[in-house]
Regions:
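A short, aromatic/hydrophobic, helix- or strand-capping loop or linear motif
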Residues: 48, 90-95, 131-137
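Charged, gly/pro-rich active-site loop segments
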Residues: 1-23, 99-169
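Helix-adjacent hinge/juxtasegments
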Residues: 75-109
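A generic "binding-loop/recognition-motif" signal
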Residues: 72-75, 147
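Structural motif
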Residues: 65-66, 84, 107, 148
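Short, basic/aromatic recognition patches
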Residues: 21-41
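Short beta-strand segments
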Residues: 39-72, 87-91, 100
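Charged, amphipathic alpha-helical segments
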Residues: 25-29, 72, 125-127
């Protein structure tokens, strides 16, 4: 592909979104919350320089953030260097009329083990504090705060909206 072809492909959704029928923020927020709550696993993409990693991992959603407990792994190599991440939540592909998926970009912070925020997330996740305290090293808690969400759902078209909806936070 030429540079111009790459630019055209990269701008596809921006051009299409400009002409699309948008949901009001309240309706879109409710749809996003419902979709996020209906799932518990995402693909978390991290990167720094030439290093990239995409990790399938469980999450919980509350207080306007994604909360991810993790023992460790190479994602932390990137997270130390770059707090910008992207996560994807999606349904299995069953055809164009049944598309459902979400891409969330945002920033992360590593929550200090056993601080109030950590304990609240563990309680929400129903992880016993006693079990966490017995581990030889603490489980890390990643808090991902969304900055932008792109949500694709075929159901939106049935409601008279464009199938792709976006929201800035």
């Amino acid at each position: 592909m030429t540079h111009e072809e790459f630019e055209k492909a990269a701008g596809y959704w921006k051009k299409k979104d400009a002409a699309g029928k948008k949901m009001d923020r309240g309706t879109l927020t409710a749809a996003m919350e419902t979709y996020i709550q209906a799932h518990n696993t995402c693909a978390l993409a991290t990167g720094a320089g030439t290093f990239v990693r995409c990790t399938p991992i469980e999450y919980s959603w509350h207080d306007g953030a994604f909360w991810i407990f993790s023992e460790g792994g190479l994602k932390f190599f990137a997270l130390e260097r770059n707090k910008n991440v992207c996560l994807a939540i999606y349904d299995p592909y069953e055809g164009f009329g049944k598309l459902n998926g979400m891409q969330v970009t945002g920033t992360v912070e590593i929550v200090e083990p056993f601080c109030n925020e950590y304990l609240k997330a563990a309680t929400f996740k129903k992880i016993p504090l006693e079990a966490l305290m017995k581990l030889p090293s603490p489980i890390h808690l990643i808090k991902m705060t969304p900055k932008h969400i792109d949500f694709l759902s075929s159901a939106f078209q049935k409601q008279g909206f464009d199938c792709r909806q976006s929201m800035e936070f």
